[in-house]
UniProtKB/Swiss-Prot annotation:
Disulfide bonds: none annotated. It is an enzyme of class 2 (transferase). This is Lipid-A-disaccharide synthase. It comes from Blochmanniella pennsylvanica (strain BPEN). PANTHER family: LIPID-A-DISACCHARIDE SYNTHASE (PTHR30372), LIPID-A-DISACCHARIDE SYNTHASE, MITOCHONDRIAL-RELATED (PTHR30372:SF4). Condensation of UDP-2,3-diacylglucosamine and 2,3-diacylglucosamine-1-phosphate to form lipid A disaccharide, a precursor of lipid A, a phosphorylated glycolipid that anchors the lipopolysaccharide to the outer membrane of the cell. Its EC number is 2.4.1.182. Belongs to the LpxB family. Pathway: Glycolipid biosynthesis; lipid IV(A) biosynthesis; lipid IV(A) from (3R)-3-hydroxytetradecanoyl-[acyl-carrier-protein] and UDP-N-acetyl-alpha-D-glucosamine: step 5/6. The gene is lpxB. GO terms for cellular component: membrane. It catalyses: 2-N,3-O-bis[(3R)-3-hydroxytetradecanoyl]-alpha-D-glucosaminyl 1-phosphate + UDP-2-N,3-O-bis[(3R)-3-hydroxytetradecanoyl]-alpha-D-glucosamine = lipid A disaccharide (E. coli) + UDP + H(+); a lipid X + a UDP-2-N,3-O-bis[(3R)-3-hydroxyacyl]-alpha-D-glucosamine = a lipid A disaccharide + UDP + H(+). GO terms for molecular function: lipid-A-disaccharide synthase activity; phospholipid binding.
Amino acid sequence: MSSIVPSMHNNRTIIIGIVAGEASGDILGAGLIRTLKKYLKKVRFFGIGGPCMQSEDMKSWYNIEELSVMGFAEIVMKLPRLLYIRRNLARRFINLKPDVFIGIDSPDFNISLENRLKKRGIRTIHYVSPSVWAWRKKRIFALKKATDNILVILPFEKKIYDHFNIPCQFIGHSLADQIPLNPNKVSARQKLGIPHDVYCLAVLPGSRIREIKMLAHDFLVCAKLLKNNFPNLEILVPLTNQTSIKKFISVASTSVKYRVLSNQSAWEIMMAADASLVTAGTATLECMLVKCPMVVAYRMHPLTFMLAKHFINIPWISLPNLLAGHELVKEFIQNNCRPENLAQTLINLLNNNNQHIVLKKKFRQLHHSIRCNADEQAAYAVLRLIK
């Protein structure tokens, strides 16, 4: 890639603006920053990022959790603050004049910001396509106006943008590059101190506080029902920060014994598990990549669900099912997301070794399909825009 890094870039400091709005974007942003630093001797990063991006020397102007909102009701409640942050970011970036701005996911926040910056002559990239194939398709045209390039992580997304002659590049997902095709479950268990002869369930109630509030209690009730069938069951709960841990403990309120883990990545914990109970989102992708059987669940505010049901026109919400184009893993949404439903499906999964074999084979095929050296490709796209 060194051939696309002109020598002029080595004689001045390159400024890159970058905004991620949640934990999954923080992971992608950190990988991109790390890769760009390999090719640019003098480079600085400003915007909004979480602990992963900040560990790569990015200067974050706001706490990433301020952007991590979900559902109609919560967005309305926090809208004044979100609008203030976006206005302030636009002002700061216009004054800073970064060589490139990258908005990672969070389309409702980032597309408008990208549009303002592009009008001021700042090159822009949107990293992770919004779900235009599911709802609000007109965002395609907003992206066309707001960006110089779109980096998509799912294979079928590129065709959508190609149809409208919008610059777009399929790069896969950096987690697919990071996670081995053949995960070592024995080693993963040893690191966590889990005996080889016990059942292990990973419980992932989400990265947002609202998700934890909606799902944590029922997830643990499900785990308790599961423990009645598997008395030696070990329950692991990966959570990323103290705010999430405190909320989980306050909401959980059940007598079942569990272990909260914050020093390991979610995928390392799921690699050690026999099955996972997962909130819809990036965690379903991580679970697929470590070849762990899963049950997917989601619940949202009733008003948000009513609106979503009216506008969204896809049969599945989990990434494994979307990638496969058919149901690979069971999904339980809203009123179907009940502990007894989740527990019975997990019991069936744990008792069906043949299903494990079929799932793991399919998961491996899907892993291959998005293992495309994403960080390098994303960095290449950024470097091409730097004048």
